[in-house]
Amino acid sequence: GVGNDELATVGGKLAQVVKIMGENVTLQIFAGTEGLSTDSEVVFHGEPPKLRVSDNLAGRFFNAYGEPLEGGEIIEGEAREIGGPTVNPFRRIQPSELIATGIAGIDLNNTIVTGQKIPFFADPDQPYNAVMANVALRAKADKIILGGMGLTNDDFLYFKSVFENAGALDRIVSFVNTTENPPVERLLVPDMALTAAEYFAVDKGEKVLVLLTDMTLYADALAIVSNRMDQIPSKDSMPGSLYSDLAKIYEKAVQLPNGGSITIIAVTTLSGGDITHAIPDNTGYITEGQLFLRNDSDTGKVIVDPFAVASETARHRQEDPRGPSAGDERLRAPLRRRGQRQDQAGERLRPLGLRRAHPEVRLRLLGETAGH
């Protein structure tokens, strides 16, 4: 019989089973139904999307189906079903190892540990993809897995040229959906990226950093499918399953006993800076901490703002019609002063992330902190 998530070909176009009701099967055609006749032939493939995994994935760029973009050789290896279950909690261990990104606003103020899942909130006009490329080049990880959704052609070429020029392709695997590709294909990209990550982390015991951009476009693709299936939309026209769909991705982050790990940093663009929109709102409940990208009014540069959460809370409190109390002001003033003095960022170092840092680095940083 036909199974859920099984691939099919409808009139020469690739599709996937999204619902089975008795003898009726609903298919999502990735490239859309334009040009298809009502009597188009349907051929079921008998299996869901799969990715062939091997060490030869490194240095390659793939599309949403796991096919090489540069026209190189097809990867030979075990074909693994994408979108599988997360690691059994019994097999997980407490994350405690620092994963350095090379960006001070992250490493000093929002230290990331292996196995963590953290969103990167940014406005659509900010250079978040450049930041992701920077993290990919500087991060102290064995493998970097990039999942690009809705990338412009310029962004795709930018990632490719940066990785090639830096000579870092041997540790980077990229899965890319561009604006020229069908939007629904974006739904496959995170699962492809995470299947590759699981191979290197679980099978090879490597430290893997997964970079996903842009999760807002991923959620928009979910909404497209939901609308086509006549499902009742939830908040902000998003599907009611948004939380579960996002959690399925983020919960792949894990620290394993064999030393392997999957750490996820995912860009979520904000519409008009609205942090209360359904996408960032649900993301905040699933993930551990947040990173914010903003324009610094003093320097004119784009920075990673470690104090955006505190300042956002303060702003909402000030807008409260009851007005801020004296106690609130006493609590808020030190935060405001701290946010204005980026050179004191070391005070917010996370001891958890420093446990396995180089001894000299740890002593120097903790010594600076103690000196304030």
Region annotations inferred by a language model:
Residues 108-371:
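P-loop NTPase catalytic core
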Residues 102-107:
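Short, charged beta->alpha transition segments
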Residues 1-101:
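Acidic-enriched and Gly/Ser
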